[in-house]
Amino acid sequence: MQYITLAEGITAPALGYGTYLIDPAITERCAREALEVGYRHIDTAALYRNEAGVGAALRGAEADGVARDDVFLVTKTLGAGQAETTKSFEDSLRALNTDYVDLLLIHWPMGDEVGAWRALEKAHATGKARAIGVSNFFGREFREVVRAAEIPPAVNQVELHPYFQQRALRPLLDDAGCQVEAWSPLAAGEAGLLHDPVLTRIATAHNATPAQVTVRFLLDEGVVVIPKSTHRERMAENLASLDVVLTDSDREKIRALDTGHSVIGWPAHPERDYDPAQYPGAAHSA
């Protein structure tokens, strides 16, 4: 397994298992299979309504010798401001049937982001969240949280894949010491990413799949990756991306696929295609 180090020296597997849009009725089975295949990083959220299944999978895995402390568990709050965020997190802990999570994220800017961040800082101070961060925060919202934070965000989870590599946002995160993480790293099957001729040619050259090449590329770019699948063989396939070795030429070709624009994000987000030119100095100031 490949690891990254977050703020305060917390380590996490760089390749995790995502649960977005996994039916709550099958989440326990899927998460349990992911753990059996070898994943030790699971990502869920209040919005997904499948935290209980993730929690059940973790409890079941303990019988196989996978302790709770062996799994890097991530969830995301739903709500605006401190009170709503606190309640959302407490509900998540109950659903997950755990005393703590390894990473707690604000899922989305929903208003009073600073108040929401205060709730996360309190969760961190009480030991209920080992690390805290944000998701889908771009120029204005991210800078606002960083300016107000006593504890800066350790992670920002955003749409990121070969067609949208977040080159404008990443310097802002780097300056803040914030790790970038990719949701839907395979572009959720949109825009034909896994049939892209560049990726398929590279995959053929390495006896790999386009999905494996994509995951390996993002890991090489310093991105935490959380692909999702409900099929055990695909889970194993994604995990085997760790064994793929790309060349410098491969990576340059994949970098050239970047369009600079979202292909699957929420159109309602006011900063969906973050452009630092809209925020003078944003690219290199926190």
List each language-model region with its residue ranges:
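N-terminal binding-site loop/beta-alpha segment at the start of enzyme catalytic domains
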Residues: 1-71, 186, 281-286
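CE4/NodB-like, metal-dependent polysaccharide N-deacetylase domain
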Residues: 7, 85-106, 122-126, 148
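Acidic-and-aromatic substrate-binding clefts and catalytic sites of carbohydrate-active enzymes
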Residues: 22-25, 45-53, 78-83, 109-113, ...
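Short, acidic/polar
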Residues: 22-35, 81-97, 115, 140-143, ...
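A structural motif
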Residues: 39, 98-101, 129, 153
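Short, well-ordered amphipathic alpha-helices
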Residues: 52-62, 89-93, 120-121, 142
